[in-house]
Amino acid sequence: MKRVWMLNHYAQEPGRPGGTRHYSLARHLRQHGWDATIIAASVEHKTGRQRLDAGETQKVESYDGVRFLWVRTSTYSGNGFDRIRSMLQYAFNVPRAVRSTELEAPDVVIGSSVHPLAAWAGARLARRYNVPFIFEIRDLW
């Protein structure tokens, strides 16, 4: 089975407010023999809900066979400094979180440009694992 890692800071599990596009893509890929992991921030963008308990730096959960790796970021509201800090935390915590889990190495990494640092984190992982990188441009800002 081929493995794909999808990096999207704001990805959502099913049933939550916000974008579930990568979850839908992962379910579709699963029907075609791919194992997908979505790597997202621990803080839910729309509500500010923290998915991790105190002391946790990452957590793996599955929804309908789609794996999510939640990476610790801090809460924020609005578009100020705290949100930028969350973006930086995501970009720098993703490689550490991946190393701390038992995820099998990917065959391809997709970095979504929900903000440039998310895609940059994906490019770093692809380089580390020597696999192709797909830069998903979603918003040209």
Model features per residue range: what roles?
Residues 12, 44-46, 76, 117, ...:
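Surface-exposed, flexible loop/turn segments at secondary-structure boundaries
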Residues 18-19, 50-51, 82, 121-124:
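Short amphipathic alpha-helical segments
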